[in-house]
């Protein structure tokens, strides 16, 4: 992992106190990095399927996703962002495809006490910074 990517992750974690875990998937579908407290490797195939899914107009696509044994209901699925929330209060995930609509991603686990929209702007901005790096 490059120092630039590491710096971007550190900056996001310092800025966004409700981001409790971060992972980056490269455009090739492989994990580039993840924070020590969040391991997505066992869920990588499903995450890649989700990222590679191209929705036809009016179609729902994948409706739920499990990461580290926690099931998230997909509440928003657009080219810019994919948001999942655990209905039992175990947190949220914000997935920002890199580039927008692409197959890479910045994946963020969000504190259960916060809402996914609390971190959305910052996560999307930092995903844009990764576009030419992954």
From Swiss-Prot:
Residues 55-62 are annotated as: Loki loop. It is found in: Cytoplasm, Cytoskeleton. It is not clear if Loki profilins 1, 2 and 3 are from the same strain. Keywords: Actin-binding, Cytoplasm, Cytoskeleton. GO terms for molecular function: actin binding. Inhibition of rabbit actin polymerization is reduced by phosphatidylinositol-(4,5)-P2(1,2-dipalmitoyl), a soluble form of the phospholipid phosphatidylinositol, suggesting an unknown lipid might regulate actin-profilin interaction in vivo. This is Loki profilin-1. Its main location: cytoplasm. InterPro entries: PFN, PFN_sf. Binds to actin and affects the structure of the cytoskeleton. At high concentrations inhibits spontaneous rabbit actin nucleation. This strongly suggests this archaea has a profilin-regulated actin system, and actin-type genes can be identified in this organism. Pfam families: Profilin (PF00235). Belongs to the Asgard profilin family. One of its GO terms (cellular component) is cytoskeleton. The Loki loop (specific to some members) becomes ordered on binding to rabbit actin.
């Amino acid at each position: 992992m490059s120092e630039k990517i590491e710096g971007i992750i550190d900056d996001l974690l310092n800025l966004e106190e409700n981001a409790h875990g971060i992972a980056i998937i490269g455009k090739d579908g492989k994990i580039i990095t993840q924070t020590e407290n969040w391991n997505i490797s066992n869920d990588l195939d499903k995450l890649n399927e989700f990222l590679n899914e191209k929705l036809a107009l009016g179609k729902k696509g994948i409706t739920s996703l499990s990461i580290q044994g926690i099931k998230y209901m997909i509440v928003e699925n657009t080219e810019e962002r994919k948001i999942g929330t655990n209905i039992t209060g175990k947190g949220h995930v914000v997935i920002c495809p890199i580039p927008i609509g692409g197959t890479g991603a910045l994946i963020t686990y969000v504190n259960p006490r916060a809402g996914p929209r609390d971190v959305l702007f910052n996560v999307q901005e930092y995903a844009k910074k990764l576009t030419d790096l992954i």
